[in-house]
């Protein structure tokens, strides 16, 4: 399966350098081409939506950008720097998988403190405020394994809100969210974009309507 790149929507170029630029990325599995070649960039103050059906390689792309997989060819520039190390990417990128990256035997609040110990968090935000934002104040001491799927998703959004990373990679963040959760995610994304952060998010279906500047990267099967 080969993914082709369709040019993003036309927008005036940003005066600031891209938060991330991908150059001729390719990836294959068992000698079968999966992705590429892909060329795109993510500017400060905007969201890039990666759209395509399930199985097309959206999650693979995010894992490559996050440094969890290696592309077969091409390279990625982070803040115009080539070949960044894993710690540098961790400081620059927050990756929210479609599977919650939570410690099941820690409480909701302990999970947020654990995140701080690993990566730090936004200097003007606290774990307690994050739990309030996502409506989990009453579950601060509840073990994650005792939370519902919806509550775990909200806790993941609290982790995201606390992240100091300027670039967010979000794998199908709107999946399984109720209308209130969609409003909450839009609020978090808007706050991030308005502070000149950048976001790349994936969707298998219709392009989500976001209250921020967006561009589109459409992946499809090669003819």
Swiss-Prot record:
Bilayer topology reads: Peripheral membrane protein
The listed locations are: Cell inner membrane
Q: Is the keyword Ribosomal protein in the record?
A: no
Mind telling me which GO cellular component terms the entry cites?
Answer: plasma membrane
Nucleus is among the record's keywords: no
One record GO biological process: cytochrome complex assembly
Q: Which GO terms describe its molecular function?
A: ABC-type heme transporter activity; ATP binding; ATP hydrolysis activity
What InterPro entries does the database record attribute to this sequence?
Answer: AAA+_ATPase, ABC_transporter-like_ATP-bd, ABC_transporter-like_CS, ABC_transptr_haem_export_CcmA, P-loop_NTPase
Substrates-to-products reaction catalysed: heme b(in) + ATP + H2O = heme b(out) + ADP + phosphate + H(+)
Broad class of enzyme this protein falls into: translocase
Q: Which PANTHER family match?
A: ABC TRANSPORTER I FAMILY MEMBER 1
Q: Which NCBIfam families match?
A: ccmA
**What's this protein's family per the entry?**
Belongs to the ABC transporter superfamily. CcmA exporter (TC 3.A.1.107) family.
Q: How is this protein named in the record?
A: Cytochrome c biogenesis ATP-binding export protein CcmA
What gene name is listed for this protein? ccmA
């Amino acid at each position: 399966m080969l993914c082709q790149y369709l040019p993003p929507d036309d927008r005036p170029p940003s005066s600031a350098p891209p938060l991330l630029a991908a150059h001729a990325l390719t990836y294959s599995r068992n000698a079968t081409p999966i992705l590429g070649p892909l060329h795109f960039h993510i500017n400060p103050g905007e969201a890039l939506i990666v759209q395509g059906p399930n199985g097309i390689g959206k999650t693979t792309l995010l894992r490559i950008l996050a440094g969890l997989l290696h592309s077969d060819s091409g390279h990625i520039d982070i803040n115009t720097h080539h070949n960044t190390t894993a710690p540098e990417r961790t400081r620059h990128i927050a990756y929210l998988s479609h599977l919650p990256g939570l410690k099941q035997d820690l409480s909701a609040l302990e999970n947020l403190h654990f995140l701080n110990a690993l990566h730090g968090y936004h200097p003007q935000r606290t774990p307690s405020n994050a739990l309030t934002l996502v409506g989990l104040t009453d579950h601060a001491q509840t073990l994650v394994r005792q939370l519902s799927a919806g509550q775990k998703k909200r806790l993941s959004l609290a982790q995201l809100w606390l992240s100091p990373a300027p670039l967010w990679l979000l794998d199908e963040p709107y999946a399984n969210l109720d209308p209130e959760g969609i409003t909450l995610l839009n609020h978090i994304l808007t706050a991030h974009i308005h502070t000149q952060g950048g976001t790349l998010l994936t969707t298998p279906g219709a392009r989500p309507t976001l209250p921020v500047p967006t561009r589109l990267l459409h992946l499809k099967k090669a003819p």
